[in-house]
């Protein structure tokens, strides 16, 4: 018993600290709703969007962002399965008359262009953000993310995830309908 009493308590601190870190990491992984994090952009003017155009004549300018009516800004990529899942809904929304600006992030330009040619282009203009800087400025965690913008260029709502399913119906659609009725 003499050997056990000589082990300093400080030797156990790294083990306790490690267990604490593992627990905190595990709890962080359990948060699966990116929409639970409020956007700091709500009520603020929309940040600038990359001046890189995905194709000629598709620059998203501040003037376009402040044009009349409700607009959506959708961050997407051709390699993103949830982006593919929401594409039909974006086409429907665009067909209804809402202007949608796209920001293609961390994608190959040719793949993005091919995707829009094959499946249809719901965007009035599309910015190309190969390094993800615009996405960072907007606080995008992963594509797809969609922002509702008013005619003053102010961010009204942020929706993380595809525009499909129950979350779309219960969270995005009411915010979108409210924005349309208040324009």
Language-model segments: residues:
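A short beta-strand-turn-helix
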Residues: 49-72
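Structural microenvironment flanking redox-active thiols in thiol-disulfide oxidoreductases
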Residues: 84-120, 130-137
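Thiol/disulfide oxidoreductase modules built on the thioredoxin-like
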Residues: 7-11, 118-122, 129-183
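Aromatic-flanked redox-active Cys/Sec active sites in thiol-based oxidoreductases
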Residues: 74-79
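Hydrophobic beta-strand anchors of alpha/beta hydrolase catalytic cores
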Residues: 72-73, 100, 146
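A generic structural signal for alpha->beta connector loops
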Residues: 43, 48, 97, 123-124
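Short gly/ser/thr-rich secondary-structure transition/capping motifs
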Residues: 31-32, 52-59, 126-129
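N-terminal targeting signals for export/organelle localization
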Residues: 1-52, 183
């Amino acid at each position: 018993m003499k050997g056990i009493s000589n082990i300093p308590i400080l030797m156990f601190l790294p083990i306790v600290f490690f267990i604490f870190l593992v627990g905190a990491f595990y709890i962080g992984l359990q948060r699966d709703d990116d929409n639970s994090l409020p956007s700091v952009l709500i009520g603020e003017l929309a940040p600038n969007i990359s001046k890189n155009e995905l194709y000629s004549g598709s620059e998203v300018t501040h003037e376009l962002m402040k044009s009349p009516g409700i607009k959506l800004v959708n961050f997407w990529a051709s390699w993103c399965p949830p982006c593919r899942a929401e594409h039909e809904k974006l086409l429907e929304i665009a067909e209804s008359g809402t202007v949608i600006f796209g920001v293609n992030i961390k994608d190959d330009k040719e793949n993005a262009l091919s995707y829009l040619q094959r499946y249809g282009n719901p965007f009035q203009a599309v910015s190309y953000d190969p390094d993800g800087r615009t996405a960072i400025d907007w606080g995008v965690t992963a594509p797809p993310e969609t922002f509702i913008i008013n005619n003053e260029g102010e961010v009204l709502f942020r929706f993380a995830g595809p525009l499909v399913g129950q979350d779309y119906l219960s969270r995005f659609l009411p915010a979108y309908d409210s924005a349309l009725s208040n324009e």
